[in-house]
Amino acid sequence: MNKTNGKMNAIYMSDLAQAYFPKSTPRSASAQLHRWIKLNDELQRRLEELHYKPRQRALTPLQHGVIVECLGEPGE
């Protein structure tokens, strides 16, 4: 997670997607992460509760945390 002075900052969806799919192009990685979100009912529900929109470019710290909680840390 991006942290500055102990505070968590927003993270771009493309950066998170690249962390999960480092061998993919940014566009392909983003498409795959969106696919994973769409296929995971619990993750999709929890993100919707946090006002996530499918094509938003930046994630709030809470949205980012939910994705990592449901999918695991990138690289695991």
Positions of PLM-derived features:
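Positively charged, polyanion-binding regions of nucleic-acid-associated proteins
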Residues: M1-K7
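Ca2+-coordinating acidic residues in Ca2+-binding motifs
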Residues: D15, Q32, Q63
